[in-house]
Curated annotation (Swiss-Prot):
This protein's name: Small ribosomal subunit protein uS11c
Keywords on record: Chloroplast, Plastid, Ribonucleoprotein, Ribosomal protein, RNA-binding, rRNA-binding
Predominant cellular place of this UniProt entry's protein: plastid
GO biological process: translation
Length: 130
């Protein structure tokens, strides 16, 4: 009679995902990178703050690069081959995050800038006087 083998980890991580979407939300204060499958189910996410950067360092390009690398590492473990990239926001980390995704070896279907642009909607905040 054979022994039952105890599982380490969950069954949820077993299914391979070949195609997905990476969302990069780059604000002036932080960069958040989220990876989903094509249905929108979140597979992995990371942010500059979650990577250990605090305060003003969260808005730096290096922090965005680190956050993107963390997400890509998780996607490679799941066998991701092709992604679409949606970039949103005016932050300094957007170009660095895209460059990191390009360098990773995952094929890019397309890159789209989905930054919301007002058609003269709400009044913007007043200019800072430093």
């Amino acid at each position: 009679m054979s022994k039952t083998i105890k599982r380490i980890g969950s069954r949820r991580n077993e299914h391979r995902v070949l195609k997905g979407v990476i969302y990069v939300q780059a604000s002036f204060n932080n960069t958040i990178v989220t990876a989903t499958d094509v249905r929108g189910q979140v597979l992995s996410w990371s942010s500059a703050g979650a990577c250990g950067f605090k305060g003003t360092r969260r808005g730096t390009p290096f922090a965005a690069q680190t956050a993107a690398e963390n997400v890509i590492r998780a996607l490679m473990d799941r066998g991701m081959e092709r992604v679409e990239v949606m970039i949103s926001g005016p932050g300094r980390g957007r170009d660095t995050a895209l460059r990191t995704i390009r360098r990773s070896g995952i094929l890019l279907s397309f890159v789209r800038d989905v930054t919301p642009m007002p058609h003269n909607g709400c009044r913007p905040p007043k200019k800072r006087r430093v």
